C-alpha cells in the first residue's frame, strides 16, 4: 500500500502547533500529520490530513508513522518546557533529548527512503544561553549564536544538546560508514526569545511574565510580576515566531551558513512592558515581587541577541516591533477575548 505524503508536526496541540498548523493549511501546499500526547483540538484536527495521539518516546509509534506516511518534513515542537522541566528534570531530558533523537532517526530513515534530505525544523530557545552574572549580561549586549552557551536550566541544556544532535545528523551522521550508507538530513533550528501570545493563557513559563501581565490587565486583575522591573530579555510575538519557522523552511539550502539561528523583535525591560500595559489599561495595578530563583534564570539569559545571520541568510524580518505588537496584535485580541475596553 502506498504511503500518504505528509508534513509531521509534533506538539500539535500546543500553542505554536495550533498556529503553525493553521498557517500550513492556509498555504495549501502541505498535508499535515499532527501528533501530540493529548487529543488534538477539533478545530485544529480539521486542518490536518491525519492526527495521532501518542508519545514521541514510543519507538513503535514512530515505526507505525513511517509505515503509513511518507514524511517530507518534520516540525518538532513537542517538549517539556522550561519551568516544568526544573521540577522533573530527568523526565524532561527523556522527552526533550531522547524524543528528539527518535524523530531525528525518523528523518534519517525518510531521507534514505526518499533519496533526498528531509527538512527538520527545530524550535530551540534563548535558554540555551547562560551568562555568569548580571554585570556580564549587561556588558555582553547582542549575543551571537556562538557565545555564552552555558545554560543553567535542564530545558536550556536539552535544547543545546538537540542543536548539536541536529548538526551531527545533518553534517556528520555515520561519518565512518561507507559512503553509500551515510546520509544527512536538512536540520534547521531557530533559537526563539520569549514569545508573547494574545490567544493562549500563559502556563507559568520563565518568560511568561510579559503575557501574564497583559492577560491580567485585560481582565482588570492586579498583577505581581515575578521579576525585577529592570529585567531585560528579547521577545517576539507568536505569529512572527511561526512565520520565522515557515520562512526558514523555504530558504534555499545553499543560502544557509548555519544550522542554528537567533531571532528576536524587541527587547524591553519588565518596567517598559508594565508602562505599556498601564497605558492601554489605565488604573490597572502592576507591582514587582521578584522570585529569586526564576530571576536568577532570567539573569542568565542575554539582554538581546544578534539576528544579523538570520536576516542575511533567509531574510528574517519580524512584523511586530513593541508598538505594533501591542497596537495591532496583543491589545485588539485580548480585549476581544475578555470583553475589555
What does each model-found stretch correspond to?
Residues 46-58:
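Rossmann-fold cofactor-recognition segment
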Residues 56-95:
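NAD(P)H-binding glycine-rich loop region in Rossmannoid oxidoreductase-like domains
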Residues 85-86, 146-150, 191-204, 212-236:
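A conserved pocket-lining segment of Rossmann-fold NAD(P)-dependent short-chain dehydrogenase/reductase
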Residues 101-154:
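Conserved Rossmann-fold NAD(P)-dependent oxidoreductase catalytic core, especially the SDR/UDP-sugar
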Residues 150-187:
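Active-site Tyr-X1-5-Lys
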Residues 160, 183, 195-211, 238-239, ...:
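Glycine/proline-rich active-site loop of Rossmann-fold NAD(P)-dependent oxidoreductases
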Residues 221, 226-229, 234-341:
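C-terminal substrate-binding subdomain of Rossmann-fold SDR/epimerase-dehydratase oxidoreductases
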